[in-house]
UniProtKB/Swiss-Prot annotation:
HAMAP family: Ribosomal_uS14_1. Belongs to the universal ribosomal protein uS14 family. It comes from the Bacteria. This is Small ribosomal subunit protein uS14. GO terms for molecular function: rRNA binding; structural constituent of ribosome. Binds 16S rRNA, required for the assembly of 30S particles and may also be responsible for determining the conformation of the 16S rRNA at the A site. Coiled coil: none annotated. GO terms for cellular component: cytoplasm; small ribosomal subunit. It holds the Pfam family Ribosomal_S14. One of its GO terms (biological process) is translation. Keywords: Ribonucleoprotein, Ribosomal protein, RNA-binding, rRNA-binding. Gene3D superfamilies: 30s Ribosomal Protein S14, Chain N (4.10.830.10). Part of the 30S ribosomal subunit. Contacts proteins S3 and S10.
């Protein structure tokens, strides 16, 4: 499990990106690159990293469900994800 501080840091980045999205878009369209440099570093969407919503694990992220592969497997085996079942052929 990821440290709580890492999860909180990622949430803070998401809020910062959302806060400056419109301003960032306007600066890009105007070609004001110096204005872009004055924005906070965390206002850039490139700095965001997908993390598991339950454990905060940064790797093995499944976008469709928003959780890591490990958490997905546990939940699917326990029948906690509707419509997902183990494949057999």
């Amino acid at each position: 499990m990821a440290k709580e501080s890492m999860k909180a840091r990622e949430v803070k980045r998401e809020k910062t990106v959302a806060k400056y999205a419109e301003k960032r878009k306007a600066l890009l369209e105007a070609g004001d690159y110096e204005g872009l440099q004055r924005l906070p570093k965390n206002a850039s969407p490139v700095r965001l990293h997908n993390r598991c919503k339950l454990t905060g694990r940064p790797r093995g992220y499944i976008r469709q469900f928003g959780i890591s592969r490990v958490t997905f497997r546990e939940m699917a085996n326990n029948g906690l994800i509707p419509g997902v079942k183990k494949a057999s052929w």
